[in-house]
Amino acid sequence: KFGHVSCEKLILCCGQWTRDLAATIGVNVPLVSVEHQYMITEDFGVPSDLPTLRDPDRLTYYKEEVGGLAWGGYEPNGIPWALEGIPEPFDFQLLESRYEHFEQLIELALPRVPKLSEVGVKQLLNGPESFTPDGNFILGEAPEIRNLYIGAGFNAYGIAAGGGAGMALAEWVANGAPPFDLWPVDIRRFGRPHLDTDWVRSRTLEAYGKHYTMAWPSEEHATGRPCRRSPLYDTLKSSGAVFGEKLGWERANWFAESGEEAHDIYTFGLPNWHDAVAREHKAAREAAVLFDQTSFAKYKLSGPDAEQALQWIAANRVDKPVGTITYTQMLNDKGGIECDLTCVRTKLNEYYITTGTGYATHDFDWISRNIPSGLNAQLIDVTSSNAVLSLFGPRARDILQLVTTNDVSHGSHPFGLAKQICIAGCPTLAMRITYVGELGWELHLPVEYAQTVYNILMTAGSPLGLRNAGYRAIETLRLEKGYRAWSSDIGPDHTPDEAGLGWAVKMKSNISFKGREAVAKQRAEGIKKIMATFTTESDIILSGRETIYRNGERCGWLSSAGF
């Protein structure tokens, strides 16, 4: 209403108003408003230098306030606000206090601070705060619009995070890239389910209630499920699948057998799914397993200049014959790994690209924004078009040959080759590649054929030891093989040489690509850190991010770990 303002870059840091304002220009910022209450007591001599106290076991926090305490907490049954949108006018007003709702926190707080039962209450304040579906704030350049930056959704810790977040966002705006790996708060971690405000609200209320609860290893969200399901969801569920969720997708984590509890029981020790994952792991090494990996993010890059565009973006060579599979990283200007994926040359002017489920928005944005100006190449998302069944293990070839008339022998279908084959009348792109370190194929096929192909594979393979397997077995298998995972082991702060992936960089060619100068500079100067894999002799449960000490001095950290 104040007219138009032209600017080169725009930053939206509008708190709970950010979502609605961004939506007016087609940008999705997944946050919602939740009522948050805290109490201010009368003065009872609290020292002004009292440190802030948090008691996660009792879901509460406390800080000094003019000789008294300001205290509150995060109840498990948070109250959403502004379900129909933030009313106008509303300028940081307070909401009506809800004493009955706050009573549950009072009961938790009294054993920790008994004095609260004796002192008077000045106020119970209730105000709306913006919260996000995963409890992390939102930073970065919006994937929908170039030069539009977001800083919002601070989950009631904006003051604590403000200095660091402000510095990071300022450098991101000034330099066009974040100063370091900010994936946990990157706006591109969100995807299609986050377009639905009701879904976001459901998940956000769960995250609000877990603000102070125990963060268990491998803990899954419970709300907003099931959302995205592969065609095999019901079949796998009836076979004992225990599902996890990634970007809205239901994915089989492990399979319970008769007599086993088909749900996760969280612990810092050996979890209840350990034996099930061990069975699946053993089958992959000795017979064969079938994974439903339909949730893979999948793109097609096509156009007369597709090869030229991908040669610039990818660190590995992609000027290879049709049918060749290329494993590659995509680097930033510092040589850091922004994407870790595979691409298949399906035609002279077309590539089929697959990447991890959780990186669908991030990787699509990275590829599309780095197609050089003036080149005729288009990137489209085909994730929902294709199902993916991954057949891995020593008996994989025997099983696959039983269900197709196409020759899948090593001589006809070697590693690194993708071929069109037919299974039960289904046109299938059979990609000879593996993330578990065994013989196998990723079978990419139209979703309507998934159930048919699954049935025929299981019927043919069961006598040879084929069994269902889930994502937790994929994790243990790839760890055993030493395969890297983006956002855990590698990322924007790690170069290919540091990650042990220098062999996948086309430095022996004269082809220009993004990040080449940084890789060359590091090779000339030498690396100062490197990724290593190792085992421990003792039966110790590790989850990742533990510190590594050598001779009493910190020398590194665990990026991933398994048992």
Regions found by a protein language model. Give the residues of each.
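Mid-domain catalytic core of redox enzymes
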Residues: 23, 39-80, 97-100, 111
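Glycine-rich loop(s) and the adjacent beta-strand/alpha-helix scaffold that form part
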Residues: 12-54, 180, 184-191
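Central beta-strand plus flanking loop segment that forms part of the substrate or channel wall
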Residues: 25-48, 104, 297-300, 387, ...
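Core beta-strand elements of the Rossmann-like FAD/NAD(P) dinucleotide-binding domain
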Residues: 2-9, 13
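Acidic, proline/glycine-enriched N-terminal capping motif
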Residues: 189-331, 336
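C-terminal catalytic lobe of FAD-dependent flavoproteins
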Residues: 57-58, 66, 88-228
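Internal amphipathic helical hairpin motif
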Residues: 304-337, 394-426
